[in-house]
């Protein structure tokens, strides 16, 4: 017993020696650390500088993302520093990649302000990404403890309530983004909304960069868009909607636009990821108070999520946004024009939709996650998809998704309404085949051809886009299994 006490005393005294000592020696590395249920866990992909030991690099990341600075400071002794130090507790080499490592780090829950994504990210992705000891650093995954999740509101509406509100069950939602995204007048914009909804879509939406420009101010767009929504809903006998983008320069402007969207009768409004975490949480609170569905466009995410060795994996954004309280988020298509590895996309969708997820290394899920009853976020698939891919979309993405065909609706040679009808018929024929027990993936092209015999717009769409695909290998792919080509 006395030897153990002496050992602990020696280690503690070494830890507080004046000057610069290794982070691992300061207590930021602990291979014997016992993870607590209340710990926030993070998994970083680290590429140490030549000559830097991966354990020391991991300890440095733990230190600089929690309590450390470059030298020992005596004021540590005025805090519960042994508790508040983040602990790197495991380092594994990345399979089949030289000089990269997975570093597992645990953070005490008291390091983070309750219910604040901004405070969480200030630590986890704050200074550490510019740290000289690592050539590159990527945040791959996190585990949020239930006690911490309970301080966030989560989605106000979520998948189940949205289906009830829209009265749409047993199939994906269908939508489209107005094209061209910039340049239309308000009246022409509203006409696009009307034609798309009347043709069979559930939603039309603003794109990420349509706000309030000289060619069309926001009030004009809202009024004409909602006129189109109301006329199409009355004609179809279905509840329909249009995502009105309320993104603006200030929170005051965003609140004003959101309030007006509610006044004119919209059931859903939209924001962009680029507004920042605090603004996103603020708008989520507003949406909950005002009984509005909140759609989030992930504009800007690929600036830091696409490269495999540096930045942040999009699955982490999915987790933060579920905590923040958005109801929709763009999460990939697999078969479209944007980055989308099938296994990675599946991991994103499971993160948004499941009440609890297990470790699944092929999908990039490094931790089990209990979502503490936070509601489900509806994934949105958008970007370069068309009716001829319907069997693949249903197979990869399932029912719980919004399929958005922008160019695949508005680019139809027979007009917007015909494009919408083609997509609706393609989807319903594929869902019917699946429900009948057919192998809709293998038979997909034939199912579409059969449906097109009684739907001219679908036949035109199939003829026009039959050879269109985006067959590129993804940048961000699975580490633990061989992955199929991303964009089939």
From Swiss-Prot:
Signal peptide: none annotated. Its EC number is 4.1.1.39. The keyword Methyltransferase does not apply. PROSITE patterns: RUBISCO_LARGE. GO terms for cellular component: chloroplast. It holds the Pfam family RuBisCO_large. It comes from the Eukaryota. It is an enzyme of class 4 (lyase). It is found in: Plastid, Chloroplast. InterPro entries: RuBisCO, RuBisCo_large_chain_AS, RuBisCO_lsu_C, RuBisCO_lsu_C_sf, RuBisCO_lsu_fd_N, RuBisCO_lsu_N_sf, RuBisCO_lsuI. The active site is at residues 179, 297. Substrate binds at residues 127, 177, 181, 298, 330, 382. NCBIfam families: PRK04208.1. PANTHER family: RIBULOSE BISPHOSPHATE CARBOXYLASE, RIBULOSE BISPHOSPHATE CARBOXYLASE LARGE CHAIN. RuBisCO catalyzes two reactions: the carboxylation of D-ribulose 1,5-bisphosphate, the primary event in carbon dioxide fixation, as well as the oxidative fragmentation of the pentose substrate in the photorespiration process. Both reactions occur simultaneously and in competition at the same active site. The basic functional RuBisCO is composed of a large chain homodimer in a 'head-to-tail' conformation. In form I RuBisCO this homodimer is arranged in a barrel-like tetramer with the small subunits forming a tetrameric 'cap' on each end of the 'barrel'. This is Ribulose bisphosphate carboxylase large chain. It comes from Porphyra umbilicalis (Purple laver).
